[in-house]
Amino acid sequence: MASYNRTRRIAEEIRKVVSTMLINGVKDPRITSMVSVTDVEVTNDLRYAYVYVSILGGDEESTLTGLKSAGGYIRREVGKNIKLRYIPEIVFKLDDSIEKGMYMDSLIKRVNEKNAQQNEDENYDE
């Protein structure tokens, strides 16, 4: 249990550092300001940190390529800010949960509109 709490705390610290780096420290033009870190998962051995990013607007593939090329720099900054024996290898992954959530929201709105229209039609027929 203590190991889980430690990895969770480390993941949260990595998320903070990477988020700050994306706002202030990375100068790659492929990385837009519309990139946000949604989650970080760290393996139990602390060798890998999977950083899930959400990219709103813009070219997702180009942005991911920019993030991967800046990975070494970001890893070095993580090492400066978090004191660990091993600095995890940063692996960026696209998190499309926001897009999926927006799609589900649009489906729910469409169903609600259909139900409202059917209720109006039924009330009109009476």
Swiss-Prot record:
Stored SUPFAM superfamilies: Ribosome-binding factor A, RbfA (SSF89919)
Cell compartments where the protein resides: Cytoplasm
Keywords: Cytoplasm, Ribosome biogenesis
Pfam families according to UniProt: RBFA
PROSITE patterns given in the database record: RBFA
GO cellular component, one term: cytosol
Example GO molecular function: ribosomal small subunit binding
Transmembrane segments: none
Domain of life assignment: Bacteria
One GO term (biological process): maturation of SSU-rRNA
Database matches in InterPro entries: KH_dom-like_a/b (IPR015946), RbfA (IPR000238), RbfA_dom_sf (IPR023799), Ribosome-bd_factorA_CS (IPR020053)
Chief location category: cytoplasm
Stated role: One of several proteins that assist in the late maturation steps of the functional core of the 30S ribosomal subunit. Associates with free 30S ribosomal subunits (but not with 30S subunits that are part of 70S ribosomes or polysomes). Required for efficient processing of 16S rRNA. May interact with the 5'-terminal helix region of 16S rRNA.
Assembly mode: Monomer. Binds 30S ribosomal subunits, but not 50S ribosomal subunits or 70S ribosomes.
Family: Belongs to the RbfA family.
PANTHER family given in the database record: RIBOSOME-BINDING FACTOR A, CHLOROPLASTIC-RELATED
Protein name: Ribosome-binding factor A
Gene that this sequence comes from: rbfA
